[in-house]
From Swiss-Prot:
Organism annotation: Sus scrofa
Predominant subcellular localization, coarse grouping: cytoplasm
Database matches in Pfam families: Lipocalin (PF00061)
UniProt protein name: Myelin P2 protein
Keyword Cytoplasm on entry: yes
GO cellular component, one term: cytoplasm
CDD domains: FABP8
Entry's localization field: Cytoplasm
Length: 132
């Protein structure tokens, strides 16, 4: 994994997040809170363990994992998912599976920004973060 991912990132733009949350099955009240949140994402690495911590006024979440190894996580909207994160062509690609459903979260670096593309079925959301 590129060390350029490491550090603290703040959300600067978000496109189609509400539709993505709807596709996930997130209820209206939680979607409203999610849309208002301006999360900070802290990515760190210790040995071969990567940690992604997301902090917002809505909720804090943290996942720690080894690339390519499945782990369990509880998402910000309280889904219990099995996830795997892999590295391909410079992107951190996360696949979450729960209740027969699947979503992908791709994190890539573009011009010094972290571009996060979330996809559920045919709904795509793009969130852009700048390093703090």
């Amino acid at each position: 994994m590129s060390n350029k991912f490491l550090g603290t990132w703040k959300l600067v733009s978000s496109e189609n997040f509400d539709d993505y949350m709807k596709a996930l099955g997130v209820g209206l009240a939680t979607r409203k809170l999610g849309n208002l949140a301006k999360p900070r994402v802290i990515i760190s690495k210790k040995g071969d363990i990567i940690t992604i911590r997301t902090e917002s006024t809505f909720k804090n979440t943290e996942i720690s994992f080894k690339l390519g190894q499945e782990f369990e996580e509880t998402t910000a909207d309280n889904r219990k998912a099995k996830s795997v994160v892999t590295l391909a062509r410079g992107s951190l690609n996360q696949v979450q599976k729960w209740d027969g459903k699947e979503t992908t979260i791709k994190r890539k670096l573009v011009d010094g920004k972290m571009v996060v593309e979330c996809k559920m079925k045919d709904v795509v959301c793009t969130r852009i973060y700048e390093k703090v």
